[in-house]
Structures are given as structure tokens and as C-alpha cells.
Amino acid sequence: MNMSEPLINKVAASGIITLNPEDYYPKEEMAVFDLKDYLFMGLILKEKDFREALKNQDWDKYKGRHVAVTCSADAIIPVWAYMLAASYLEPVAGEIVMGDEKELQKKLFLKNISTIDPADFADKRVVVKGCGETPIGDYVYMEITRLLRPVAKSIMYGEPCSTVPIFKKK
């Protein structure tokens, strides 16, 4: 190579668009509402006591937060108990999910991914970034692929300098 020739960044000149899943990672405040705290002897949900406890609960601590409603105790919880908790949370909370904090995070992540406009990637070569600071669930990569496959020219996984081909339009 002649030292007088300018260096050309072939990656930058390739027209590849990098989509970083971390950009869609949920940053909102989350909370967990655990029904185990309302069980009699850690096993039984008494309707009258439960209704009274929810009526006296300070729901403002969930204001603007996304909430996972779960029961971490090994108990049989009637469906109406989750419904009743949701009826109190709905006016103050953001998203409400039946499940643990991971389920809530998954729902929020997928909701954020759904804001991607596929038209922005029409006939483009897309690399879905695979390495980062934040652990990203496999479901995110699958959803991005599902969303972009109908429009993208190609989809790759990794970094622009080292990719694994996923899809290429014929």
C-alpha cells in the first residue's frame, strides 16, 4: 500500500445502517406489587381482608411507574385478585403486567421496539448490533428481524466490520 493514498473507511462507505437494540431498552421506573404480602399465613387469600388492605394501600407510590403484579409465594391465587389489584393500579400506574419484573421489562422492551418505523429501513442493509453494555434478550433480536425482514435489503447480526448474515432479499 502506498502511504500517500488516503485511507478509505469501507464500512462507512458501505451504506450499512446499524440498529442498536440498547437504544430501545426500557429506562422507565418499574415496581413490583407482590400479592404474597396479603396472604393469611403466607398461603391463603381472604377476600374481605384483601379488599380492605387494597382499599387502604398507598397507591401513589406507583404513580407513573410500570408495575408487575405477581405472587412470589407458592399459593393458589384466584383470578379476581389480580383483577382487583389492576383496578387500583390502572388510574396511577403506567403499564401493568401480570408476572415478575422480567416479564414487565420484556413487555416494555417489545413495546419500544414496536416504535421502529420499518419504512426507515426499506431497501437498506441493516446490522443489528450484537455486543453492548446491556444484556439483551433473544426475543428482542427475533422481534427486530420479524419487523425488518419484509422491507430491508439485508439483515446482519454483529458489528459492521464483522457480521453474521441473517437475511438477504433476492
Placement of each model-derived feature along the sequence:
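Short acidic, glycine/serine/threonine-rich loops at helix termini
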Residues: L108, Y139-Y141, F167-K170
